Amino acid sequence: MHKKVHGLDLMRAVAIALVVFQHGALFFYLCYGSPVIWTKAGTIGVTLFFALSGFLIGGLLLDLGPSLSEPGVAARFWVRRALRTLPNYYLFLLINVGFWWVFQKARGLPDPAPLLPRYVFFLQNFTGQRAWFFAESWSLSVEEWFYLLFPLGLFLGLRLLRIPFKRLYWALTAVMIGLPVLLRAATLSPEDWERGITKVVLYRPDSIAIGLAAVALFRRFPQAWARLRLPSLAAGIAVLAASFAYMGIGDPDHSTAARVFLPLVVNLGSVLLLPWASTCTSLGGRAFAVPVRAVARWSYSLYLVNLMASTT
């Protein structure tokens, strides 16, 4: 029997804690002028979510392997994925409509009804992130499009082109990492770095794809993966800390290098945590482990509700 990997729970709990912290810090920044750097924590947190999601879903895709060429297998993957994510998403979409009606309509915020078709089909931030309504849903749109298109590429490549699964997996992963970098290099976004780049579907597939690359390396080189767990953890923390400092102190809004490569650097820092997180089977005593597991279990719902709660 395999031991439960608690390090992944800790990584998920840290990710949601950073997101919640950012939303609270944003309130204090707008109201009291607290340091702007604290409003960047969520960028790190969401990227941790993306890397972790890619690692876990990539593992499922590797387990399915060549069987993804069968329509029934591919369909079951999408249905199971949809059942895990869509009910909560659409529930909170409706809750946000009610939230606008009760709290935000009187403040003069526009009626979100014309925007709803975009949210239903995850188009609210496909090419740009401008909508004020249900703002935290941007990352869910990134994930839903990725997990529609990447398995679709596997299905078509296996069934129509007869490409060997591992070669196809790596080719699609490389495209999903490289293409967003090229798109970020080509864009001249008039918006700030966070809204114009990091929250746009077309510019973020690399954040998930790097997790798919990581799990494939884990499966291929398990001994080296375990041996490097502590050096990799230290390097990942250092990279994320440096990225966080730059986002708060530097000027990513007016830097081409930041627009193109900073998301990739944060991706790298996030994925470097995975060798430790994916091999850690104990979090110590129950006083620490139990709340970590609880936060990790409820992280998706916490993500959907915390911004709305903090702006009530």
Label for each model-derived stretch:
Residues D9, A13-I16, T47, S53, ...:
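Residues within membrane-spanning alpha-helices of integral membrane proteins
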Residues F77-A82, F121-F122:
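A short amphipathic helical element positioned immediately N-terminal to and/or at the very start
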Residues L8, R76-F77, T85-N88, S139-L140, ...:
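Alpha-helical transmembrane segments and their helix-entry boundary regions
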Residues F50, F55-G59, R81-P110:
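Specific transmembrane helices
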